[in-house]
């Protein structure tokens, strides 16, 4: 009989070293496969204006169900291993929103209304505790649980449950948990997990200047995500505007020595300046005499304000693209390339976005 350090059993990789390293690596690979599957589905099927909503549903139904299979019973799960799973999750969220790689993590979850992987594992683990306690005391699963309670081994499943209860402020004994229904306990756990996650989002917000205007008092999708009056392209644009990752120089100061606008050269290139930039707004007749009244902060306003301002930004960005192509077409071939900072009218791209989510509408 051949000896092996790893063996797959019921979907998990069991290691002779007692770690989850091989299992987590396998789940990350499965997660990447699920992302490819979701991308394929979303590009082959015409989803129109509901592309983002359906992408988030597929994230829950396909990606999460595959990557977290059996996660409620994983032991010795480290912070690093959870972070590895969350990195894969954020790849999917960024693709769905066509978000920049520098988008603050808190924006990905706050505007989609989704819990992170750590929170989802905590819910599953605590609900599995309720399942164990609901079984007869003579059953093997219940006896193993009671035995672990008497031991003091770091990384035991019981130790992770105790940590979850402390972190989420769930002050309930096993007897208390046994005395409530599954629905009641699940409702309590979800409430506690969401409250803790919102607290974590607000803690991250305090560390990032791009999240200055982020408001997260309740974990639910931002209204613009679900509003059918906005097409997918404009929803993704509004997300970039809100998270300060639109392709303008001041959003990426570290990669631009010259902050002046490459369209007019009159002011620093900010999201707010685009609304006033003469070469970009002069051809938009409906903005004549009104640019001074435009408020960039409407991207954080109510849905009516958001629809109005994102449509204006969309038109301005189209003008910027036209200006860029006109300049390129006017450069004689013999002159060779011209550096963007040397001429007004050249638009310097500060960064490369992730692959665009292709959807009709």
Per-range role (PLM):
Residues 4, 106, 264-266:
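A generic hydrophobic-helix recognition signal that picks specific residues
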Residues 6-143, 148:
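Non-catalytic, peripheral interaction segments enriched in hydrophobic/basic residues
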Residues 34, 156-159, 293:
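Surface polyanion/phosphate-binding segment centered on an Asp-His-Pro turn
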Residues 60, 88-89, 100-245, 249, ...:
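Extended C-terminal regions of large enzymes
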């Amino acid at each position: 009989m051949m000896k092996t350090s790893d063996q797959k059993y019921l979907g998990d990789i069991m290691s002779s070293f007692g770690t989850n390293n091989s299992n987590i690596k396998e789940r990350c690979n499965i997660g990447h496969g699920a992302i490819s599957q979701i991308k394929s589905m979303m590009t082959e099927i015409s989803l129109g204006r509901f592309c983002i909503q359906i992408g988030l549903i597929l994230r829950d139904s396909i990606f999460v169900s595959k990557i977290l299979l059996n996660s409620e019973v994983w032991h010795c799960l480290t912070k690093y291993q959870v972070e590895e799973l969350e990195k894969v999750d954020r790849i999917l969220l960024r693709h769905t929103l066509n978000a920049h790689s520098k988008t603050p993590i808190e924006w990905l979850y706050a505007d989609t209304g989704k819990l992170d992987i750590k929170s989802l594992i905590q819910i599953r683990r605590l609900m599995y505790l309720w399942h164990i306690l609901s079984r007869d005391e003579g059953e093997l699963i219940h006896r193993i649980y009671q035995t672990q309670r008497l031991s003091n081994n770091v990384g035991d499943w019981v130790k992770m449950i105790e940590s979850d209860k402390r972190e989420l402020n769930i002050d309930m004994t096993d007897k208390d948990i046994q005395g409530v229904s599954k629905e009641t306990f699940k409702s309590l756990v979800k409430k506690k997990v969401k409250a803790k996650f919102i607290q974590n989002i607000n803690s991250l917000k305090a560390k990032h200047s791009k999240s200055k205007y982020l408001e997260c008092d309740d974990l639910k999708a931002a209204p613009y995500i679900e509003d059918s009056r906005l097409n997918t392209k404009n929803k993704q644009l509004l997300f970039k505007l809100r998270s300060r990752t639109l392709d303008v120089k001041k959003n990426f100061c570290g990669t631009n020595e010259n902050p002046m606008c490459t369209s007019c050269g009159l002011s620093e290139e900010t999201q707010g300046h685009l609304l006033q930039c003469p070469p970009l707004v002069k051809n938009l007749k409906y903005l004549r005499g009104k640019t001074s009244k435009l408020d960039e902060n409407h991207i954080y306003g109510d849905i009516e304000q958001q629809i109005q301002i994102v449509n204006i930004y969309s038109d301005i960005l189209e003008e910027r693209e036209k200006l860029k192509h006109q300049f390129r077409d006017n450069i004689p071939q013999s002159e060779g390339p011209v550096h963007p900072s040397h001429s007004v009218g050249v638009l310097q791209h500060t960064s490369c976005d992730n692959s665009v989510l292709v959807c009709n509408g």
